[in-house]
Amino acid sequence: MTFKESAINESFWRNFSKIYKKPALVNKYLAGHSDEIEKVVITNFNEFNLSSEYSIYANGGFGRREMFPSSDVDLSIVQHNKNSKNTEGLERYIAKLWDVGLKVGHSVRTIQDIKKVAGKDPVEFTSYLTRRSLISSPDIDIKVNDILSRSWGKKKFFNAKYNEQEERY
């Protein structure tokens, strides 16, 4: 499967002056671009028969269906158990996404890894909190949601996000 991201981006920039004047057109473009990328991500995930051992989530702009031209495709891949055998298939999957021209940023974690990182890092916690399921099972979604609900108290999370913003800006 080939992906024509450059054609999509060229179309966006060629029509930018018309699109920019109408926010609804911008939103339509961003969602459409996200949907095209999602098709590539899911089709290739299925091609490598990964769904029995992994779940895949969209994060960031991709997760919100707000893919701007040349944005990274942020993926969170959850390994169903630490003894998954198809790691080679997963590596080939990521390589294929790069080969078709996607700028993929990804993490591969077990449920236990998510518990550790989400409990310590408010950025990672927020990333998992705002994820969008592409291919997953209800069982995995429940486990991730359970981890997130136990990771941060409201006050602790607010303070961590406040400090993050202070450091960033």
Predicted feature descriptions by range:
Residues 1, 143-150:
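Charged, low-complexity surface segments at secondary-structure and domain boundaries
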Residues 22-29, 33, 85, 150, ...:
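Non-transmembrane, amphipathic alpha-helical segments
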Residues 37-87:
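Active-site nucleotide-donor binding segment shared across nucleotidyl transfer reactions
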Residues 34-42, 48, 76, 87-143, ...:
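Conserved catalytic core of two-metal-ion nucleotidyltransferases
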Residues 1-3, 26, 32, 77-80, ...:
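Metal-dependent phosphohydrolase cores
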Residues 1-52, 70:
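N-terminal regions immediately upstream of nucleotidyltransferase
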Residues 5-9, 86, 158:
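Generic alpha-helical segment signature
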Residues 27, 59, 64, 126, ...:
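Generic secondary-structure boundary/loop-capping signal
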